[in-house]
Regions:
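N-terminal Rossmann-like FAD-binding beta1-loop-alpha1 element of flavoenzymes
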Residues: 1-16, 384-395
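Glycine-rich FAD pyrophosphate-binding loop
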Residues: 8-32
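Short hydrophobic core segments
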Residues: 15-17, 118, 131, 138-157, ...
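An anion/pyrophosphate-binding glycine-rich loop and adjacent beta-alpha core
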Residues: 21-29, 37, 43-44, 79, ...
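N-terminal glycine-rich dinucleotide-binding loop that anchors FAD/FMN and/or NAD(P) in oxidoreductases
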Residues: 28-60
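Feature captures the FAD/FMN-dependent oxidoreductase FAD-binding
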Residues: 60-142, 291
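A glycine-rich dinucleotide-binding beta-alpha-beta segment and adjacent secondary-structure elements
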Residues: 114-120, 292-372
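A conserved FAD-binding loop/helix module that cradles the flavin
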Residues: 149-168, 370-399
Length: 404
């Protein structure tokens, strides 16, 4: 929709095709239905959150910045707010407000909106001249492909854009899931299924090199298959070629306390509960759902009285609290990823216009390109910026008739 709006605002006659039963289906579920539409940071910080081809985005971000995105939606009557991590949301916390505003603006700009699947892009003599749908052929001076990647295929992102790109002679880099939950070895995570942790630290360690590849403080979630939550999704973007045994998640349950202070806290709690079983002495330090599996990790009899806990056992408890280790086996299916890593090779795309360097009049924007970023509104901003650039450039194609 952003590409259609941009093209229409720059004077083009625009036809927008959507194969789903409604427009903005994927946008409606972003940010757990709240729509984290951008990040209120400067360009340097923004590009620091783009691990794949950040330099390609300089021109697009300069042409339609995070400030431009905020102004765009506020001018459409959607008040915004900024939360922790500079994440920008609609005040209503409803993604549908963003979708409805864009739909209204499309119609106000004269965009013809058609719900029909596009089967192919028609190319003649190296020029995009239209599209073929299931029921009609439409001539056009420019075609913009904004089909998304492979994540959330039920929203329509099932790889059509990659098929169009390959048919046009473009290289599509390896497609992998990113911003995706992690699958763990063993039954530890399943035993704590549904438990959400806040104010913990997470380190992801490459077991082959011993190097920490990701570290952050925040929230995470144990699931029946492994780990999820904001930090885990962000961590997944830093992991390459995930195989069993390659990565280990290390969770610091008490990051505000060093080992000495945590030991002192344990001694204080043990004095408080000196006549209780070990299993009944950890309630002030750990969530109830974690206590039983945690005790198993410590290899201490849960019925042992706390006044009988040895110094060596106490050290074992402290070590587990400061470094709870989870071996990573893999990731969830790409259909569960927030975004797709990989896509149309940006070396074959003009960074200023998003036009194909191989086919005149053919443009690509958004997740279909080999661009991905961390969580925090960065990926939607990439979609908005590249779509705006593509729409503006497509509107300048001459002679001008209809643009998709």
């Amino acid at each position: 929709m952003m590409a259609a709006i941009s093209a229409a605002e720059h004077g083009a006659d625009v036809v927008l095709f959507e194969k789903n039963d409604r427009f903005g289906k994927k946008l409606r579920i972003t940010g757990k239905g709240r729509c984290n539409l951008t990040n209120d940071c400067d360009q340097k910080e923004f590009l620091g959150n783009v691990p794949t081809n950040p330099r390609f985005l300089y021109a697009a971000l300069s042409g339609f910045s995070t400030e431009d995105t905020k102004s765009f939606f506020e001018n459409l009557g959607v008040p915004l707010k900024t939360e922790r991590g500079k994440r920008v949301f609609p005040v209503s916390d409803k993604a549908q407000d963003i979708v409805h505003a864009m739909e209204r603006h499309c119609r106000d700009c004269g965009v013809q909106m058609i719900r029909e699947k596009v089967k192919s892009v028609v190319i003649r003599d190296g020029i995009a001249v239209g599209i073929q749908t299931e029921s009609q052929a439409l001539e056009a001076d420019a075609v913009i492909v904004c089909t998304g990647g492979l994540s959330y295929p039920t929203t329509g992102s099932d790889g059509d854009g990659y098929r169009f790109a390959r048919a046009a002679g473009h290289r599509v880099t390896e497609l992998q899931p990113s911003l995706i939950p992690l699958v763990a070895e063993g039954k530890l995570c399943a035993s704590m299924q549904g438990l959400s942790l806040k104010n913990v630290s997470l380190r992801m360690v490459d077991c082959e090199t011993g190097k920490c590849v990701y570290e952050d403080f925040g929230e995470m979630l144990f699931t029946h298959y492994g780990l999820s939550g904001p930090m885990v999704l962000s961590a997944s973007a830093h992991l390459k070629d995930i195989t069993p045994g390659k990565y280990q998640a290390q969770i610091d349950l008490k990051p505000a306390l060093d080992e000495k202070k945590l030991d002192a806290r344990l001694l204080s709690d043990f004095a408080k509960y000196q006549n209780k079983d070990f299993a009944n002495s950890l309630g002030d330090l750990l969530p109830q759902k974690m206590i039983e599996p945690f005790i198993r990790l410590c290899e201490i009899d849960p019925r042992k009285k706390v006044n009988s806990i040895t110094r060596e056992e106490r050290e074992r408890i402290v070590r587990q609290m400061k470094r709870l280790c989870v071996e990573i086996r893999g990731v969830r299916p790409i259909s569960e990823a927030i975004i797709t890593r990989g896509g149309v090779d940006v070396k074959e795309i003009s960074p200023k216009t998003m036009e194909s360097k191989l086919v005149s009049g053919l443009y690509f924007a958004g997740e279909v390109l080999d661009l991905d970023a961390y969580t925090g509104g960065f990926n939607l901003q990439i979609a908005f910026s590249t779509a705006y650039a593509a729409g503006e450039a497509a509107a300048c194609q001459t002679p001008r008739t209809e643009n998709q």
